[in-house]
């Protein structure tokens, strides 16, 4: 029997009606079976569908990270990605996808910058809308997030974002506005932070903007543990508190109702919205059990997506593509055999598979001799034990070790790392429990092995019953596990290759830890990461890498950051590569600069002090399952690179506009750069960047006609004009070029950015082919937020349309006019 909302509301008890307004557990809404109200499942994350388990999860497709997706500048491709996301949700039994993330990476240091799309709100909104449209075409609801201002991780639950109304509207709300207009997703997730003194989840002004001004009526849900009050959040418009069991609704709502602090009509309105969400979501044909769908066509899409996201930053003397006739190639770097497929936090998942660059090069060059050297490790924590681990199992108890214990649950393990935030077992006390992880560790090299144990909770490591690491009483807070974990505590032991040793971790859950922290999210459960590595001689590793590079015909040096450096829960403290990486790159370039290509994997910019010496630099982001294939396809010319930077790439962290106003100080952060975010700032102050917004090279060449032709000379918001230019592929291979339309208001009496992106198109051309490319402006192209009037304003006057292949490479110009000044609100 179908869900009938009016029938449910007329027959439901007050208790059940209030119960609808919060989740029943970590991922599900509250069901009412007797009224045919099913439970709806939500799931992370931004680059793949994890399902209901952080711990021992079902494998999934891992897509490239958000900045990689935006680097394609391809809305049609992102619609396909959205469809794949929707299908993965259906396979995991999930009705609602918690994504995408469209916060603004105002600083390169943001921990979740890799999850977001772009520093430009138009690009971020357009790409997100395409992805959402694809996802919701499968019946799965998208919950776009985080509304609004969750642009840093430091004290994200407590920080007060102080931002002008103009910057809030033009930069931070604009992506949500575009998504509301172009996609209208069924759900919206609020942010953890405050905006100008009020938590967004409690701000009637902010939530009314969505529903009243924008005429968009999604289910509004909290971020996980991002509800802080009963009365204010209910009256502001928050429909659903997540996760469950509820902390601020239930009996507290009943009490507030009796005190007339919440109206009956408000409860009815929130319950109706939840039921509308349930009604829409329950139509999705979800799987009854969580499963995978690792299909060939999905692999092909993921590989194409990865390759098309890659940005060719530098190609001096056309070092790329490399010839496939190479007799000897050196593969150097931490990421050659261990690719960074995603960032950390909500983006984490268990992938179906991972293709390394080593594997991909071996496939592409089957007759080439490969010299492989790590050169320098890039890990922040010692690598988790998996390949050398057998017979691993984890036992759960309510009692600590050394007491009489009753076994409550058992879980086979494939590696020595786990997160237990959503782990449940019958009779296990979620508030306080203990676990013992045992397994057989067989090292492949003799020598001194270093062990590192990081915990959210407490932990002891034993090797053959000898205590090697104690991470219990003297704990120091680190950045792992959403910012709740300790730093890595280290110990060492001499081991023999081929001999099997008994590994044992005695673990206590989160509440056994004495550490406390402000502003971070306490998801509960706990977590641990045990890593191990042969104690290495760093100088000898570099010498071996240099020797390989000197001997080889060409060298690919692949390194960068990973999920330990970029993750939800903390921000980066600097923009540098991990310790020792720059020295490795410099040493290799000293002997092989003319035959070395540098491949960087990171979700946001890193410093490149060696950039002027490198002939080839490739930005490969976090590329998902097909990372190795995508990189190799570009490097050897099977794919002509067409990616464009969605972020400006500063020379130094001190140059970025948020440098003096980043992180929470005294409980607040001042957005002092105002509307001058990213390229808007660098251009306004004349600050040189290493690579500009929109930059990306190709293996072919293009010409663009110098004059922009308009479909109409007068700009009318109700029917914006189209700008057109001719573009020709003048090279020898097929290639795609992204034409970017920037609008400038050079005569405006109001201080404005030099130019702003308001349209783009990606054009694929065969060698010698010429085409007219059309770019449609949107309604917002000439507008800014007038803080006095509290409305959008389009000033009368002459405007410039600038079309180029980056924010700094403008190839065509034209002018148009606005015939009269207009004010407006809404979408």
UniProtKB/Swiss-Prot annotation:
Pathway: Glycan metabolism; cellulose degradation. This is Probable beta-glucosidase H. Transmembrane segments: none annotated. It comes from Aspergillus oryzae (strain ATCC 42149 / RIB 40) (Yellow koji mold). The active site is at 223. One of its GO terms (molecular function) is beta-glucosidase activity. The keyword Lipid biosynthesis does not apply. Belongs to the glycosyl hydrolase 3 family. GO terms for cellular component: extracellular region. It comes from the Eukaryota. InterPro entries: Cellulose_deg_GH3, Fn3-like, Glyco_hydro_3_C, Glyco_hydro_3_C_sf, Glyco_hydro_3_N, Glyco_hydro_3_N_sf, Glycoside_hydrolase_SF, Ig-like_fold.
